[in-house]
Amino acid sequence: MNKNQKTKEKTCAFYASDYHFEMISLPYINKKLDESKEVIVLTENNLKETIKTLVSKINLNEDKKVDILKIDWENNDLNKFKKINEDIKSKKDMVIFVKGKENYIKNINETIEKWTEKSKNVEIIDCYDMEEISQDMDNIMDQYKFTLKTTGKNIIK
């Protein structure tokens, strides 16, 4: 699937539900926001309500909660691609999460690859629905160098 990637070192993650995705990604997102990186979440479904619920229950200071909620958690890819384009032009460091079914991830990655071809300051994290790809997880992991877990980014061995 991602063997044709040319410019980005990619990471994968696997989730069982929207809340699970958010629990896996939030520590990493929080770290990247602390590093002043732009965080963009391209998602097949709207996560606005689930992230609000989760953020209200986690132990973070209010400023960090506000920063997390400022991220666009809705499924409006067109607006997010406009934002990616702006960030590329201004040479911002960014982390892009791509969350959804395997076909969605493949299509979004093809577009991201074209748009960010010459940009070296982009990190992409593909987040797969475990229910959909459970039989193919090993093959998918073979295409990545890292996996994202709640403990952070780990090298796949």
Model-predicted regions and their roles:
Residues 1-157:
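Non-catalytic regulatory/interaction regions at protein termini and inter-domain linkers
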